[in-house]
């Protein structure tokens, strides 16, 4: 019985020796985009709270009100007796905002991708093994979903639709189901995909298009409902989350009525999971209610991100192709990236170093993210501090 434990310890030791050791740090969220981390108050430039909704009074009030009305837990999966009345209300809001036929609320983003994707790729249902064309930098949960299905991925270069089309052409004669999988905003790079271009390829080659809008929901697209909302009815399935721009927790998919019915009967993560608690649903509902009223907030955050990027680029830093509140500062070397993160911490700023295996070798970076909870002065402070800290590291 000791052998597995020895193997686990050896794994941890190898990660630590490689400088890739991860550990938890207790935090306490504070108002105005601040956080107490290891007892130190920092301006938080590492969260996904893009719209500042995680501390919004309406979300907190509705979460408490729905907890009072329906209790602290759903008590069962939705298929058993946990399909509480609020689910239909939230799904109706999603349908209206996304311009789709149907919606289905799920428990979390990782769970959604890792259970919905295998359901879609089921070889027994499709009558054979499908072809999956996946952006190389898709989220780990999407790659995991394909692996669970036991299907081989054809990975195209990140954001390169010409490369994707060459792959689609090469396999055009194969009489099997074809799937294109992509995020719309990439979580570690902050860049956007050409949704219209993906739709054109989907239509040209008869493929099923699956888009992950986790980091676009709340921030981009019509009324903040994501980039795919500008193309109603043209994407087969859109996945998104409530845990980032919407300030809460949970996930959703939008699709056709027929596909929703299929997932209810086939997606294991939906079938076998206890439904989300009423308090979480209350925060979801409030966020969706607020979204159409938040155009000025979205514009401010995007404009602030553009100013910070411009300042960093003017200082000679590489921020990739970011066009969202996610701003990577590409460093490359892991130890220098960690040193930059520590330098910012000494100045009262939280910017987390992102290293392999989260990102490819040689692309370690600081992943910065802006929030509507920040002031313009916070953003100016960040734009000045990053180049200064990096100069000190470089000597």
From Swiss-Prot:
Gene3D superfamilies: Aspartate Aminotransferase, domain 1 (3.90.1150.10), Type I PLP-dependent aspartate aminotransferase-like (Major domain) (3.40.640.10). Keywords: Biotin biosynthesis, Pyridoxal phosphate, Transferase. Its EC number is 2.3.1.47. The modification N6-(pyridoxal phosphate)lysine is found at residue 244. One of its GO terms (molecular function) is pyridoxal phosphate binding. Its cofactor is pyridoxal 5'-phosphate. GO terms for biological process: biotin biosynthetic process. It catalyses: 6-carboxyhexanoyl-[ACP] + L-alanine + H(+) = (8S)-8-amino-7-oxononanoate + holo-[ACP] + CO2. Substrate binds at residues 22, 139, 358. Pathway: Cofactor biosynthesis; biotin biosynthesis. The keyword Metal-binding does not apply. Pyridoxal 5'-phosphate binds at residues 109-110, 187, 212-215, 241-244. Catalyzes the decarboxylative condensation of pimeloyl-[acyl-carrier protein] and L-alanine to produce 8-amino-7-oxononanoate (AON), [acyl-carrier protein], and carbon dioxide. Belongs to the class-II pyridoxal-phosphate-dependent aminotransferase family. BioF subfamily. Homodimer. This is Putative 8-amino-7-oxononanoate synthase. It comes from Magnetococcus marinus (strain ATCC BAA-1437 / JCM 17883 / MC-1). The gene is bioF.
């Amino acid at each position: 019985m000791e052998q597995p434990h020895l193997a686990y310890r050896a794994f941890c030791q190898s990660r630590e020796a490689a400088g890739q050791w991860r550990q938890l740090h207790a935090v306490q969220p504070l108002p105005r985009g601040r956080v107490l981390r290891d007892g130190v108050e920092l301006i938080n430039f590492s969260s996904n709270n893009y719209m500042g909704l995680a501390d919004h009074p309406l979300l907190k009030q509705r979460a408490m009100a729905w907890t009072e009305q329906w209790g602290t837990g759903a008590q069962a999966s939705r298929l058993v007796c946990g399909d509480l009345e609020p689910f239909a209300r939230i799904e109706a809001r999603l349908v209206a905002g996304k311009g789709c036929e149907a919606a289905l609320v799920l428990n979390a983003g990782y769970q959604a991708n890792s259970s919905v994707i295998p359901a879609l790729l089921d070889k027994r249902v499709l009558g054979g093994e499908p072809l999956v064309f996946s952006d190389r930098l898709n989220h780990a949960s999407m790659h995991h979903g394909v692996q669970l299905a036991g299907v081989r991925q054809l990975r195209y270069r990140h954001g390169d639709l010409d490369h994707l089309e060459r792959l689609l052409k090469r396999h055009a004669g194969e009489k099997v189901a074809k799937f294109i999988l992509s995020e719309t905003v990439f979580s570690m790079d902050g860049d956007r995909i050409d949704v219209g271009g993906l739709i054109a390829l989907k239509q040209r080659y008869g493929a099923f298009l699956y888009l992950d809008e986790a980091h676009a929901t709340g921030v981009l697209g019509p009324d903040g409902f994501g980039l795919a909302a500008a193309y109603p009815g043209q994407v087969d399935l859109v996945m998104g989350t409530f845990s980032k721009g919407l300030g809460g927790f949970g996930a959703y998919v939008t699709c056709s009525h027929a596909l929703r019915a299929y997932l209810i009967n086939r997606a294991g993560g939906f079938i076998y999971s206890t439904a989300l608690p009423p308090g979480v649903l209350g925060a979801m509902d409030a966020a969706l209610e607020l979204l159409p009223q938040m155009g000025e907030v979205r514009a401010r955050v995007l404009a602030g991100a553009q100013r910070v990027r411009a300042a960093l680029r003017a200082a000679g830093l590489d921020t990739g192709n970011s066009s969202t509140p996610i701003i990577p500062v590409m460093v490359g070397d892991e130890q220098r990236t960690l040193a930059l993160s520590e330098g910012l911490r000494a100045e009262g700023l939280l910017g987390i170093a992102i290293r392999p295996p989260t990102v490819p070798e040689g692309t370690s970076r600081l992943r910065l993210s802006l929030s509507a909870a920040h002031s313009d002065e916070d953003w100016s402070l960040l734009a000045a501090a990053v180049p200064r800290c990096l100069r000190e590291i470089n000597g």
